[in-house]
Every structure is written in structure tokens, then in C-alpha cells.
Amino acid sequence: VHVAHLDHGLRPDSADDAQFVAGIAREWGFAISIERRDVAAIAAKRRLSLEEAGREARYTFLAEVAQEEHVNLIMVGHNADDQVETVLMHLLRGAGMGGLRGMRPLTPMAAMHLATATPVPAELRLGRPLLPVTRAEIEAYCNEHRLQPRQDASNAETTFLRNQLRHEVLPLLESVNPNLRAALRRMAAVFTEDHRVLQQATRAAWEQVVARR
């Protein structure tokens, strides 16, 4: 296991977060890579939102560390509640079937078209092992095993769309349908299977109509 942490430089205490992660890595005997990138400058230069710039900087950093360490699997901590927020966000943006599947348990990093110094290898994957697990279940596990996670204060700010959905929109929708989160996860699973079948049928039809020379 090799731990990687990117300091986005967006909060005064972000350096403390990096030190917290470094301390845990040392305690557990893991090697670690820590870097700071100016996400605000990236956003301004490329005319991206802070969310978009942060995502690109984060995954570019992780892909670069993976290549330096000669590994082909990156694992991140997205959970079932993150999935619900992602599906709802894609729905609001008018995404098609591909987007309404939500996040995938395993994603080829090359498909993310990152601005890495060298091309991302085809075999490099992004894994999300906690995708079936809810945030409440993760917090219960931490309490049971006396693990003290560090909270990102920016998660409480509703200036970001994801946080607005988490703190304002989802609670309102759940007042109408208390089972909304489960319903959105089921919808994502249905779209995932539909997308798989359509892709399979498309490939089969392509083989029939395209002549190879």
C-alpha cells in the first residue's frame, strides 16, 4: 500500500490535513506521497469551477504517483451517499444513460483524459471499494474501532453544488420520499445494466456491418 494525499491549498488548515494523513501512514507503516497544488490558480487559468479544477488536479496527481510507484490500481473512498449525490447532480445537468449510472466501482484512468506529464497506462484503474457502503455505516465502523477521522470543514459549505445537494436538496426530497437514496441507487443500477446491454448490442451490430480489410 502506498498512500497519496493532495493538498488543494484552498483552506488555511489544509496543511494540517496533510500532516494528519502523514501521521496515520507512518503509524501503519505505509509509504506516502504528499504534494500541494494551487487549485484556485488552476481554476482561474483554465476557467474551471473550483470543484472541477480540484477533481482534475487530484486525479492527475494520483495517476502520476501511481506511475512513479509502478502500480496499476488507485483506490479512493467514495461511498454510497456520494453515489446518490453524483447521480442527482448528473440528473440535474441532463446527463444521458452513461452519466445516470453514477460512479463505477472500477474505472480506467486513461478514459479520464488527465493532463499528466506522460500518457496514462491503459491498465491503470481507479477503484471505489466503499461504493456499496453508506456514510453512516462508515462512521459506525470508525466509532466501533475507535478511529478518529479528520473532517473537511469545506464539506459544510453550500457554495459547492455537491454540498448544496447534500445539505439542502436531498433532505427536502427525502421529506417527500424517505427511501429516495435507495431509489436513486436502484435507478443507477438499472441504467448500468441497460448501458451494458446496449454497448454489447452495439458492438455486435458493428461487427456485422463493418467490413475488415
Predicted regions and their residues:
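ATP/NTP-dependent adenylation/nucleotidyl-transfer catalytic domains that generate, transfer
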Residues: 109, 116-124, 159-213
